[in-house]
Each structure stands twice: as C-alpha cells, then as structure tokens.
Amino acid sequence: MKKSIFFLLLTTLFFGFSPLECQAQEGAILLEKDHSLHSNFHKFALSRINTINRNFLHTPENMFIEGNGSVYVGRYHKVDHSSVVVEVKQINSNTAPFIGVIQYVESVFESNGQCNISAAEGPFNPVRHRKVTEIFRYVQNRWQ
C-alpha cells in the first residue's frame, strides 16, 4: 500500500498529473501522424534512440568478448530504428496538455567463434529482446 501511494505522489510531482488522472482520461485524443507536434515528437524519439544506442556499454564498435579457450562469444546491445513506435496524445491537463509515448525493442546480439577475432567479425544474431515503453510530457514547447 505504501509503495502505491509513494508511486502516485512521485508521478504526480514528476509529470504534473497522476496516473489516476490519466486513467480517468480514457478518451484522450490521439493526434494524427501529419500533425506538427507528432512529427516534432517523432524527431525527438529518433534522437533519443540514437542517444540510447550511443550510450550502451557494449555497442557494435565496442563489443564484449568472452571466451573459455575453445569458444568465444561477441556480444552487443542495439535498438533497431524499425522497432520504434510513437504516439502523441492530447490529455486534459493544464501543466502538460500532451504526452508522447515511445515504444521500442532493445536487442542483444551474439556471435560465436573459435577465437576473439572471429567472434567479433560475426555473423551476429539476436538472442534476447526487451520491449521498452517511455512516456514524455510536452511542457513549455518541448518534450521532457
């Protein structure tokens, strides 16, 4: 019970509206893809995905390679731009009239080889996926 009250308070302070307020607004208006705010959020989302890909600890340029002498594994993380889905919704809030939702898939790619060089050269195959959803609010003419 204390965790749910804390979560409600935290989200109310951070986003300017409570999750209960969002749930009450099931009739939130989904903006069309040709709306200028939607295209603005789409650019923001792609920039965010580029930042996420750049900030992974293990990237295609800096992959993790481990081995036990006979088999080596090269591994890195990446968000595929084709997995990105964005939505912009108009809500009834004075502080944040719009929210943007980004959904994407983080994938872990691995390659096996007989030495660290062959493991680093690939071919790489996706071995794990994680679906991520991020919610942003539009305040003072920018996405936060």
Role assignments for model-derived ranges:
Residues C22-I117, E121-G122, P126-R128:
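Flexible low-complexity loop/turn motifs enriched in small/helix-breaking residues
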Residues S4-I5, H77-D80, V132:
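Small/flexible residues
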Residues M1-L9:
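Bacterial N-terminal signal peptides that target proteins for export
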